[in-house]
Design a protein with these regions (language model features):
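Conserved pre-catalytic core of RNA-dependent polymerases
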Residues: 1-171
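A shared catalytic/ligand-binding motif for oxyanion handling
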Residues: 171, 184, 203
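N- or domain-start disorder-to-order transition segments that initiate the globular core
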Residues: 177-178
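Short, conserved micro-motifs composed of acidic
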Residues: 144, 231-236
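Catalytic palm subdomain of template-directed nucleic-acid polymerases
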Residues: 102-119, 155, 197-226
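Active-site nucleotide-donor binding segment shared across nucleotidyl transfer reactions
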Residues: 181-197
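Structured loop/turn residues at secondary-structure junctions
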Residues: 39-40, 192, 208-209
Length: 236
């Protein structure tokens, strides 16, 4: 069947362009790359994305609200509610807000394919994604000329409908490996221990004691570095 095919025929029509964000225009870090994708590619990707979304919804816990329909504002409301209850019952609650440096740009491709396998994503979907990212090259233009072309091995396509799902699964793998689900640190809500709330890669850690929060934070940082993500200085 056509839709079972794992060949991706339209990637040749795709391109990447840089868009200035803010700040000094000659600073590379002040630009964001965005993928421009042909209409034929978008039709194919939309069909595949709907299938990937089904697997993603089964794998992600309810503490993850990133890019999930109807959940966009849930975590802000949850954090505010927890803070209000802490004041009401005069309980100390410690928070740490983790923001990764350029998370979309730092996703390691080979690591991503392994994570998708661990998450139970079908081989034909993984193969399609690999084809979408295969053979990517870039060059850098400087005042001294243009560099040789070199392979790109990191970063998901910003502007592609697949990318939010891929980042969610990548971030979920990191949190699973930290063992936060089994950790005793956290706060009790309706008999359930909660120590993290997430929106994609943005993670809020919480605990009743400062030492517990530091322990959670170190676990997340260590696992993040193993997957080539770097956490910015957290706001506590």
């Amino acid at each position: 069947m056509f839709f079972q095919s794992i060949l991706f025929l339209f990637s040749v029509l795709n391109g990447f362009f840089t868009i200035p964000k803010r700040g000094y225009a000659k600073e590379c870090s002040n630009y964001r790359t965005i993928a421009l994708i042909s209409h034929a590619s978008k039709v194919m990707l939309k069909i595949r994305q709907a299938r990937l979304q089904q697997y993603m919804n089964c794998e992600l816990p309810d503490v993850q609200a990133g890019f999930r329909k109807g959940e966009e504002r849930a975590q802000i409301a949850n954090i505010l509610w927890i803070m209000e209850k802490g004041r009401e019952f005069q309980k100390n609650i410690y928070f740490s807000f983790i923001d990764y440096v350029k998370a979309f740009d730092c996703v390691h491709h080979n690591k991503l394919w392994k994570i998708l396998q661990v998450m139970g994503i079908p081989d034909h979907l993984i193969c399609l994604l690999r084809n979408l990212y295969a053979g990517q090259e870039t060059t850098v233009r400087t005042g001294l000329g243009t560099t040789d072309w070199f392979q790109i091995g990191r970063g998901v396509h910003q502007g592609c409908i697949f990318s939010p799902c891929l980042l969610n699964l990548y971030a979920e793998y990191i949190i699973r490996n930290t063992g936060l689900e089994e950790a005793q640190a956290g706060i009790k809500i309706a008999g359930r221990n909660i120590n993290n709330l997430r929106y994609a890669d943005d993670t809020t850690l919480m605990a009743k004691r400062e030492e517990e929060l530091k322990s959670l934070l170190m676990k997340v940082k260590e696992e993040s570095e193993k997957s080539w993500l770097k956490a910015q200085q957290s706001e506590n």
